């Protein structure tokens, strides 16, 4: 089997999601770190953006699409069409959280960060995820975890790292974060990943 390659910049960024997924699933992969997008690389990118996932001749961009492809390959998307739909619903919410945080975080001083936490546009997503996890063990509401539980961990990890955790109590999400942080599959990667806010 061809070992896949992920191409991205030397930061956590959006590639953190598929990297954590590959690490957790135990799939070996190559990481191609680039400082800039060269002209040759740009020609391979459908939307001229990274990350890029490549497996032999197959190439795909856009983080949600990469996550979906890897999860499908490992049967990690949910057992029923309802579970898969709920997982996709939550992933869309996670990507919205990421977009909100990355759109604001680099422009904020501490006072603005505090205001963001208290009036946070991401609060409604955290409340929604917390509600689902209060009623079900997993976000897709099935009997087993799916990729979206792991992606929720990456989201909470991101938001915490950026200092943008919304006000309120989210014990289920914090418990989820602790669970994956202590996972043997992820431990080595989490300790060696780029030390960047983004």
From Swiss-Prot:
Alphabetized PROSITE patterns for the sequence: GST_CTER, GST_NTER
What are its E.C. numbers? 2.5.1.18
Domain named GST C-terminal: residues: 80-198
A single GO molecular function term of this UniProt record: glutathione transferase activity
One GO biological process this protein is involved in is: glutathione metabolic process
Query: What highest taxon heads this organism's lineage?
Result: Eukaryota
Task: Provide the coiled-coil residue spans.
Answer: none
Reactions catalysed according to its record: RX + glutathione = an S-substituted glutathione + a halide anion + H(+)
Q: Which keywords belong to this entry? A: Transferase
Which positions does UniProt annotate for glutathione binding?
Answer: 8, 42, 49-50, 62-63
What EC class is this? transferase
Q: Which SUPFAM superfamilies match?
A: GST C-terminal domain-like (SSF47616), Thioredoxin-like (SSF52833)
The UniProt record lists the GST N-terminal domain at 2-78
Query: What does the record give as the function of this protein?
Result: Conjugation of reduced glutathione to a wide number of exogenous and endogenous hydrophobic electrophiles.
Give the family, as the similarity comment puts it. Belongs to the GST superfamily. Alpha family.
PANTHER family with a match to the protein in the record:
GLUTATHIONE S-TRANSFERASE (PTHR11571:SF150)
Q: What is this protein called?
A: Putative glutathione S-transferase alpha-5
């Amino acid at each position: 089997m061809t070992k896949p390659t992920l191409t991205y910049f030397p930061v956590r960024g959006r590639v953190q999601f598929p990297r954590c997924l590959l690490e957790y699933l135990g799939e070996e992969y190559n990481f191609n770190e680039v400082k800039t997008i060269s002209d040759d690389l740009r020609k391979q990118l459908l939307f001229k953006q990274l990350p890029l996932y490549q497996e032999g001749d197959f190439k795909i961009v856009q983080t949600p699409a990469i996550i979906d492809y890897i999860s499908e390959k490992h049967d990690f998307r949910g057992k029923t069409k309802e579970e898969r739909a709920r997982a996709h619903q939550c992933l869309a919410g996670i990507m919205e959280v990421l977009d909100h945080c990355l759109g604001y975080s680099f422009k904020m001083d501490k006072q603005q960060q505090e205001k963001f936490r208290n009036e946070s546009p991401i609060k409604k997503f955290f409340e929604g995820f917390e509600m689902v996890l209060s009623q079900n063990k997993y976000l897709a509401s099935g009997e087993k975890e799916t990729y979206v539980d792991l992606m929720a961990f990456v989201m909470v990890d991101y938001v915490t790292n950026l200092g943008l955790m919304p006000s309120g109590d989210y014990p289920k999400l914090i418990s989820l974060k602790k669970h994956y942080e202590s996972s043997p599959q992820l431990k080595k990667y989490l300790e060696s990943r780029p030390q960047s806010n983004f």
